[in-house]
């Protein structure tokens, strides 16, 4: 499958842009505990996790996209699968960390 003139790169760009915007928005929303107060000691650490994950996601997605273009793999399916796996891993990690405190 040739990617020139294909709609897949546009879907990939849209998915990356949407994911980036959501990560930036979510990184500035502090986690609230059951008491309704944000734990002050965890907010900077939590923010750094979100921003580092965003950087990791973007760099990996770019290199992953380049590999897909090289081997003519459908970018739409592969990018969404990769993003889904990364997001699931992050949610599990964050929930484990916050509940262990």
Curated annotation (Swiss-Prot):
Keywords: Cytoplasm, Membrane, Nucleus, Signal, Transmembrane, Transmembrane helix. The keyword Cytoplasm applies. Residues 1-27 form the signal peptide. It is found in: Cytoplasm; Nucleus membrane. It comes from the Eukaryota. It is a multi-pass membrane protein. One of its GO terms (cellular component) is nuclear membrane. The chain crosses the membrane at residues 42-64, 79-98. The keyword Membrane applies. This is Uncharacterized membrane protein C27F1.10. It comes from Schizosaccharomyces pombe (strain 972 / ATCC 24843) (Fission yeast).
């Amino acid at each position: 499958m040739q990617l020139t003139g294909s709609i897949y790169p546009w879907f990939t760009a849209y998915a990356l842009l949407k994911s980036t915007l959501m990560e930036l928005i979510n990184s500035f929303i502090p986690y609230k505990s059951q008491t309704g107060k944000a734990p002050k000691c965890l907010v900077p650490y939590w923010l750094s996790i979100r921003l580092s994950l965003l950087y990791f996601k973007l760099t990996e997605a770019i290199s992953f996209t380049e590999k897909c273009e090289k081997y003519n793999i459908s970018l739409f399916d592969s990018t969404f699968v990769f993003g889904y796996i990364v997001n699931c891993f992050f949610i599990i990690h964050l929930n484990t960390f916050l509940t262990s405190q």
